[in-house]
Design a protein with these regions (language model features):
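HIT superfamily nucleotide-processing domains
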Residues: 2-149
């Protein structure tokens, strides 16, 4: 990913050390987060170093939202969660990105946010095991269908 020269040298999303990229285009990428409690946890990262959705043009906003919705569809298809959490904070890393997290009624933190206090002991996640290749294919297919119409 080529970042503009205005990107801060310490931005971990502009200059990632290692990412498990499931899909990408010139504007953004979808990565899978390695979290044993939340194996379907993905992140949608805008490639350009901007902080807010409103920093994007209307066309870029639509593209970002279309990708976000397509990834949600893929996560629902692959993981059959009770809920999908979508979050965009940027308080710690002020680079536009979205968290997409399949949630289950009996996951470690439910009904609290995954960053909140655990509600039960960790252990095996209630999520089905889905390998990277299957999830990447589901993401690509959902994006193609969502963008097509």
């Amino acid at each position: 990913t080529v970042m503009p020269t205005s990107a801060p040298k310490d931005c971990p999303l502009c200059f990632p050390e290692r990412e498990n990229v499931l899909w990408h285009d010139a504007s953004c990428r979808v990565i899978r987060i390695d979290d044993p409690d939340y194996p379907g946890y993905c992140r949608l990262i805008w490639n350009e170093h901007v902080a807010e959705m409103s920093d994007l043009s209307p066309a870029e906003q639509r593209h970002c939202f279309n990708i976000l919705m397509a990834v949600e569809v893929a996560l629902r298809e692959c993981f059959s969660p009770d809920k999908i959490n979508l979050a965009s904070f940027g308080n710690v890393v002020p680079h536009l990105h979205w968290h997409l997290i399949p949630r289950y009624l009996d996951d470690r933190h439910f009904p609290q946010p995954v960053w909140g206090a655990a509600q039960r002991k960790g252990g095996s996640s209630p999520a089905p095991r889905v390998d990277d290749a299957r999830l990447a294919l589901a993401v690509r297919n959902a994006i193609a269908e969502h963008i097509a119409g």
